[in-house]
């Protein structure tokens, strides 16, 4: 079994992608947080992945590349709640409440994105928050804030 220990590049940076045979390794956002991953590709080849602790896999990362072939990480769609608040105060209240639940989150300029949870959805409905449930491809996995000490 081949064990990958580094990320070589990302498929977004490769010119003439169509000239390569692409073997995909499909991972969930939970998988990419693991230190050691044993998984089969879409071509039924078993691989191991063990990256340095500070390295995290992202969609499109290339683990193997030669003149003809790429082995690429593909993150599966994640079931999420995308929250867009009416005001900054409302967003602060929602973020505080979800933080009390130790809910991991990602943020854009105008949105808070959290993994789907029926209790969180119920809270948002009860508080008449603007949100939508969607399946999206995350750029990186949900994780708890590493800045919190």
Swiss-Prot record:
Keywords recorded for this protein, A-Z: Chaperone, Cytoplasm, Nickel, Nickel insertion
Compartments where located: Cytoplasm
Main location: cytoplasm
HAMAP family: UreE (MF_00822)
Family matches, as NCBIfam families: PRK14112.1
Protein purpose: Involved in urease metallocenter assembly. Binds nickel. Probably functions as a nickel donor during metallocenter assembly.
Record-given protein name: Urease accessory protein UreE
